[in-house]
Amino acid sequence: MKDLRLPEKMSRAKIKQLLNEIKFSQERSDELRDKFGWRYVQSERPKTGKSYNKLRIYTFHTPKYKYIVHIEEYDYDYFLISFFPKLNIDFYVKQQKLASMGKKYYDEYSYLTKENIPLKILTLLVSEMKNILKDKPYSSFGYFGAPDYKMGEKTDLFNTKRVRIYNELLNGEFSQTHEVKSLETYSGGLILNKAVLQEYPNLELYCEDILKSHL
């Protein structure tokens, strides 16, 4: 008789293999920094209408794209991280037109590069988070992704299995000092310093509200 449980076993094995592959390695991170040319560009004070205290800008390159990384610094040593490929002006003009017509459209966060490198990028970001913690040990972090396309409604924001995978890596690295909160509705998460959270119970709401304001 055919073993109907085989696909489930294979699925579990695949997940276990994937989780083993995403364990953070500083050696691997250093290798990726060199390979992708990770570089600090500059820090900026907030522009009009922005609520962060400081913006740190980084770049790195893949064979197809140049990526921009933004790390926004807020009160309570909260850092919100985002990244996106640098796209030409024609892309934005076209998407603006689609949005104005009520059609599905993309932004820099939801544009699909099809490079299949999100875990490599996350490794780079974890490495930078560790660097920040060396300087500010009570820091907390947030990150967010995006749906495959936008329709200008809250229903765009959907659960994603990728977030669970990402948070496995984050839990493995930060669980001793931080609580990792999965925000699958926003395709993102929070990494909250336990000591700060104990002293300021509203920290989670503060960080989540800032993350949501970007979506």
Region locations from a protein language model:
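Non-catalytic substrate-recognition and accessory regions of acyl/acetyltransferase enzymes
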Residues: 2-4, 12-215
